[in-house]
């Protein structure tokens, strides 16, 4: 989705779409320009491949824009994404919903990912509108308290 010269590209679940709207609002409030923000998914290997493809495609299409990778894939493996030469910033799932993250983006470290299990407070951001969408979503939960052996989601989203 194209927003005020900052593109936000969401992969994966509806929660990412919801949070993408929060990121868009925070980007607008902080007058963030010339960025591509990729809200990633890590639920499957194929999802991560799509994220990596989009990173490279976005940089080819808009070489002057700075690339920010956030979302579950960034939360789970920030080193992997900061080591992709096209990526400028990697931001964790909790950090992407904090206004300070976006107001000081160029002044901070390139990797802003904290331990997702140490912070279990809910954010209090409200989505004012879903731009370019015919459906809206509400947030039911942010994480999961179960630890199914096959599931990576708690490590990307934290506890509920």
Regions found by a protein language model. Give the residues of each.
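Proteins enriched for Cys/Gly/acidic motifs involved in redox and nucleic-acid/cofactor modification
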Residues: 1-160
